[in-house]
Amino acid sequence: MAKKSAINRDLKRRKLTAKYAAKRAKLKAATMDEALSMEDRFQAQLKLAELPRNSSKTRIHNRCEITGRSKAYYRKLRMSRIALRDLASRGQIPGMVKSSW
């Protein structure tokens, strides 16, 4: 089980990312827009740099929703391999059975 602080930190980053996503996209588009003057593009870049660091999507780390584990993470299921195996062996995931051949 991961530390509660690590899980909470990641949740906080996800909330900040969602909050600033539109503003960040708008400023990023302005910095790339060739039609704008260099001064306007530079001002957009400065405003982008003033946004909170944790509002960037690259700062989010995928974590298991059950255990908080960050490694061996399945994106589609949003859980780690260990939690997946545990739930599957208990029969709590519909349609998932242990393979045998």
UniProtKB/Swiss-Prot annotation:
Gene Ontology CC entries for this record: cytoplasm; small ribosomal subunit
Molecular function in Gene Ontology: rRNA binding; structural constituent of ribosome
One GO BP annotation of this record: translation
PANTHER family in UniProt: 30S RIBOSOMAL PROTEIN S14 (PTHR19836), SMALL RIBOSOMAL SUBUNIT PROTEIN US14M (PTHR19836:SF19)
Similarity comment: Belongs to the universal ribosomal protein uS14 family.
HAMAP family reported for this sequence: Ribosomal_uS14_1 (MF_00537)
Name of the featured protein: Small ribosomal subunit protein uS14
Record organism: Parvibaculum lavamentivorans (strain DS-1 / DSM 13023 / NCIMB 13966)
Gene field: rpsN
